[in-house]
């Protein structure tokens, strides 16, 4: 089954990625992806786009050739307080806010520090999805994070790239996260974390973990465009109302 939604992609605006929005649209058409989010790295990363890049995402059309585009960011969790590198009224202009740990911004520390930072980001109300929480470089209290995610309605990502090109050794942590999410009622989402358009919608490794723990697929945000849009609307993203009529034939 091809899941029709991808929440995590990077364009040439993050200079260690290699595809344009046009490239992603072309691959989306080929693969049957109906909705994807463009989520370049937050401005605290050395090669991230300027702050204005995210402000001006409003110029992107809502849909091109039947493919919807979400305007987003993969922000950086900066400190133990869970602060991220995108803020203020600008956050409300985005459709989706991802956030995670990245070594150049928040060097790995200890389990207690990582857990506190991640839970504070979850509690902040500013973050919709925590990216690659299974990164072995950042050990966390998985049950505590999953419980917070369930309580505050934040999704946890099973990052497909973590099993292929980066964050080697993530399998055990991601399996534990999926199990905890199932037991505690947290929402999961699969992210390709594409840095080149060819991997858009590539979820094979992430899906194998989700299936191994028997996580309910009717809770996966990738299951349909409306499932994700409803989730984002419930989290206060009024901007996604523009997209909802375009998927009026969709079953959440």
From Swiss-Prot:
One of its GO terms (cellular component) is cytosol. GO terms for molecular function: phosphatase activity; zinc ion binding. It comes from the Bacteria. GO terms for biological process: bacterial-type flagellum-dependent swarming motility. CDD domains: PHP_HisPPase_Ycdx_like. This is Probable phosphatase Shewmr4_2619. It holds the Pfam family PHP. It comes from Shewanella sp. (strain MR-4). PANTHER family: PHOSPHATASE YCDX-RELATED (PTHR36928:SF1). Its cofactor is Zn(2+). It is an enzyme of class 3 (hydrolase). Belongs to the PHP family. Zn(2+) 2 binds at residues 16, 41, 195. Keywords: Hydrolase, Metal-binding, Zinc.
């Amino acid at each position: 089954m091809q899941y029709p939604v991808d929440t995590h992609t990077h364009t040439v605006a993050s200079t260690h990625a290699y595809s344009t929005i046009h490239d992603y649209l072309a691959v989306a058409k080929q693969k049957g992806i109906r909705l994807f989010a463009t989520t370049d790295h937050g401005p605290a990363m050395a090669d991230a786009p300027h702050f204005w890049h995210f402000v001006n995402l409003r110029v992107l059309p809502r849909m091109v050739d039947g493919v919807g585009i979400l305007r987003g960011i993969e922000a950086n969790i900066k400190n133990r307080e869970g602060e991220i590198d995108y803020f203020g009224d600008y956050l409300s202009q985005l459709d989706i806010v991802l956030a995670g740990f990245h070594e150049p911004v928040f060097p790995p520390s200890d389990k207690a520090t990582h857990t506190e930072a991640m839970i504070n980001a979850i509690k902040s109300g500013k973050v919709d999805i925590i990216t690659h929480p299974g990164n072995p470089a950042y050990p966390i209290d998985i049950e505590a994070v999953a419980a917070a995610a369930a309580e505050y309605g934040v999704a946890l990502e099973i990052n497909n790239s973590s099993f292929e090109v980066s964050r080697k050794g993530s399998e055990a942590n991601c399996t534990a996260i999926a199990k905890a999410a199932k037991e505690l009622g947290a929402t999961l989402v699969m992210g390709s974390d594409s840095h080149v358009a060819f991997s858009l919608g590539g979820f094979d490794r992430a899906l194998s973990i989700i299936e191994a723990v028997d996580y309910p697929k009717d809770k996966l945000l990738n299951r349909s465009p409306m499932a994700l849009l409803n989730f984002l609307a419930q989290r206060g993203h009024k901007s996604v109302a523009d997209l909802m009529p375009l998927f009026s034939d969709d079953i959440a």
